Amino acid sequence: MNGKYRGRGFGQGRFQSWKSGRGGRGFSGKWREREHRPDLNKATGKHPEQTPQSLLLQSTLDHFIPYKGWKLYFSEVYSDSIPFIEKIEAFESFFTERIELYDKDEIERKGSILVDFKELINDDEIIKLIPNIANELRDTPEKTLACMGLAIHQVLTKDLERHAAELQAQEGLSRNGETVVNVPHIHARVYNYEPLTQLKNVRANYYGKYIALRGTVVRVSNTKPLCTKMAFLCAACGEIQSLSLPDGKYNLPTKCPVPACRGKSFTALRSSPLTVTMDWQSIKIQELMSDDQREAGRIPRTIECELVHDLVDSCVPGDTVTITGVVKVSNAEEANSVSNNKGQKTKASEDGCKHGALMEFSLKDLYAIQEIQSEENLFKLIVNSLCPVIFGHELVKAGLALALFGGSQKYADDKNRIPIRGDPHVLVVGDPGLGKSQMLQAVCSVAPRGVYVCGNTTTTSGLTVTLSKDSSSGDFALEAGALVLGDQGICGIDEFDKMGNQHQALLEAMEQQSISLAKAGMVCSLPARTSIIAAANPVGGHYNKAKTVSENLKMGSALLSRFDLVFILLDTPNEDHDHLLSEHVIAIRAGKQRAVSSATVARMNSQDSNTSILEVVSDKPLSERLKVVPGETIDPIPHQLLRKYIGYSRQYVYPRLSTEAAQILQNFYLELRKQSQRLSSSPITTRQLESLIRLTEARARLELREEATKEDAEDIVEIMKYSMLGTYSDEFGNLDFERSQHGSGMSNRSAAKRFISALNKIAERTYNNLFQFHQLQQIAKELNIQVADFENFIGSLNDQGYLLKKGPKVYQLQTM
């Protein structure tokens, strides 16, 4: 007994106490008591006759508690003198008045009820019984929410018992005792809570307080079970007890509940009915940066939030949410409710009590929106309010304004159809110094939801979705990129030509409006319903009109064809335009509102007086109508108000095409098809027709109209023609329809075809597909192929895959 069993406490502890009855370690009391008192129950350590009496006493106490689910919400023993009994009675009367407004089956299924905070603080009964309800909810949220939960639990129990009694009375059944009604634990979810707390103000003094936050979801973890109560088995006497685990933190019991047992060793029973688990999820919220909250040089703050029970899976990365909950010390907030402010229905808004909205509008905002809509020439006002610092480029600004308003998405909720995107994409290409970046920043600033990124500092995962590993649990979680964060808004990408291989990540997001991810065993799809507005500089610093847009940007045709509008900005010298531009810049720098001087007005008026009356056209083109007439003053709409106007139109206006507008768009599309077939250029597809429809709907939405008219379609056709004029024209100013509509493909297409055909014949005849550079020059000279730069011509054939460079001045033909 000395060696093997001494360390296990057998020889000196348990064996000794059993044999002689003198105190072994940890077992002496119980064994001695059993030895001298054989009437004790060996399993529980209690008298056999005491057990049913104590159970009877306990059931009698439970019978006297007027609230059926008291133990589900409070650990205290019920007493009439408990101070929060009055609160429960007040909430009970509040819910009793509104019980018919709630879906009782839905409340039981989800285990939660939505409570409007504004209704709560304006209720007369609540004000009379709990005058400082707002302060009590803020300072003691757990007790107040538990009182609400118990009140609705009591109301539902009484209602179900009444229905059961009525049903029994109708069927003529005799009532043998009371009807047993089992209502689950119900959580009170408060929404519309005020005031909203900014993330920068969440400090230590908010610990344990009830607050409301608003932000963007940037990371969502997997759903896990969180243990709130664990059953433990005493190794000494076999007694089972249930221990509460606050916040899911594992803890062992300190003693056995049996008074006579002194056992200190316990085993966790994970499969016991007494073990209670709940769904748990962690999300990361990033603050929304509005104009009055921007802080230079500071990255946006984030906070971790925990979602439990029915709030799990109520949002995805990129959603804008309002979260109310209790601040905890572990740098996280336990959410009490999640209001997902998106167009789609979520867990928090399925009941119909609150449907998420993109923006909220006060009465003052609505009056301002009505005043803007009543303007006579609204399109001109909005175009000139977009970026007043940049002079001219009215049609480019018009295209950007239409992208801000966007068209209507079709079949978004129909699972049997593929949705058709309503967000137009715009690309602005041009020489440096023409204000592309300023226009892009202005658009992102005006948009209700805008994300601005720069192409040369952006990665593929930064644009789309990142799969990161959670440091605490080791699980993978999704972190949203720029396109997902710009969902139902604008994503502005500057330096678009310097993105490298990141272009491929945009293809799915631009057409399917979603981002699919398959990494580390996780396969999912996130919404990215955003308009992409990009600005790019051409290769070499200057736009070469002898090349196509694709050759100027080194960009594939698959990406270019997804842009609805491609604008080419060229820095061409023009005396009148340069004079106006210089005066505009000087006036802006001087801080004047009027950018055109009186001398310019006099000069322009003298020019207008010499114009023949025969040259005056009553129906001015759109480019003329959008220009500010000399002598005319325009008061631009402030960006803060314009943002509200755009948000209102995107939220409430869904225009449709009239018959005349559809006919104009169809005629223009058919004419494009006819030209593409006749001149063997790149095909015009239905993608161009959908672009025309989207932009026409945006033109009607800009004026808050439900129907797009004939004039809207004519304006869009003019903007589209202006866009195509830049992509089709060559270095001589002629329209080369052999180029594709969006400038993809090659310049000198017919010359390239003849050249490659001649190389094929020579290679077949000589059985050699390698050519020296001087040989290629000689062949081009014999074919009389006139190109401005022969090296660029061969380089474009190399880019298109016709020729492969095998060494210095040596090329291999790839089309044999």
From Swiss-Prot:
The record's annotation in PROSITE patterns points to: MCM_2
Q: Which SMART domains match?
A: AAA, MCM
Q: Which residues form the signal peptide?
A: none
Which Pfam families has this protein been placed in?
A: MCM, MCM_lid, MCM_OB, WHD_MCM8
What are the alphabetically sorted keywords of the record?
ATP-binding, Cell cycle, Chromosome, DNA damage, DNA repair, DNA replication, DNA-binding, Helicase, Hydrolase, Nucleotide-binding, Nucleus, Phosphoprotein
UniProt catalytic activity: ATP + H2O = ADP + phosphate + H(+)
Where are the residues of the annotated region Disordered? 1-52
Q: So where does ATP get bound?
A: G430, D431, P432, G433, L434, G435, K436, S437
Query: In which residue ranges is the amino acid composition biased (Basic and acidic residues)?
Result: 30-40
* Gene Ontology MF: a single term: ATP binding
**Annotated positions of the Phosphoserine modification:** S606
**Which residue intervals define the domain MCM in the entry?**
378-585
> Main EC class of this protein?
hydrolase
GO BP annotations of the record are: DNA damage response; DNA replication; double-strand break repair via homologous recombination; female gamete generation; male gamete generation
One Gene Ontology cellular component annotation held by this UniProt entry = chromosome
Superkingdom is: Eukaryota
Localization annotation: Nucleus; Chromosome
EC annotation from Swiss-Prot or TrEMBL: 3.6.4.12
Record's subunit section: Component of the MCM8-MCM9 complex, which forms a hexamer composed of MCM8 and MCM9. Interacts with the DNA mismatch repair (MMR) complex composed at least of MSH2, MSH3, MSH6, PMS1 and MLH1. Interacts with RAD51; the interaction recruits RAD51 to DNA damage sites. Interacts with the MRN complex composed of MRE11, RAD50 and NBN/NBS1. Interacts with CDC6 and ORC2. Interacts with HROB; the interaction recruits the MCM8-MCM9 complex to DNA damage sites.
Instruction: State the family it belongs to.
Output: Belongs to the MCM family.
Q: What does this protein do?
A: Component of the MCM8-MCM9 complex, a complex involved in the repair of double-stranded DNA breaks (DBSs) and DNA interstrand cross-links (ICLs) by homologous recombination (HR). Required for DNA resection by the MRE11-RAD50-NBN/NBS1 (MRN) complex by recruiting the MRN complex to the repair site and by promoting the complex nuclease activity. Probably by regulating the localization of the MNR complex, indirectly regulates the recruitment of downstream effector RAD51 to DNA damage sites including DBSs and ICLs. The MCM8-MCM9 complex is dispensable for DNA replication and S phase progression.
- By what name is this protein known? DNA helicase MCM8
Name of encoding gene = MCM8
